[in-house]
């Protein structure tokens, strides 16, 4: 299964289990130039072993664009594209931290935002189920 498809499947799973309580969180880079607000259910995170996720160490969750609001730092974002150039890996030009990325959902035109959960404020990673995704062999 492709990465984004897997991510969306994970999100559907949350809904099916009736635990789809959304909460607002603030997130951003390290220096604070990039800040955003997201609405999500912190239940699962995806840990991927592909070339970039491995080096970055990010824990990801995927949400529709409508649940994401960039508060500041649009001009501080540097886009990094590689491989099939489908996912925009946005990182802060000043501190280098990637707090989110964007891509198009499989078979559609809908934009999906990948949130690096490590960049959210006031969360406890120990309460989140980590799902492994084998991006390396795809
Ligand atoms: Zn920064």
Can you annotate each of these PLM segments?
Residues 13-28, 33-138:
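A short Gly-Trp-Pro
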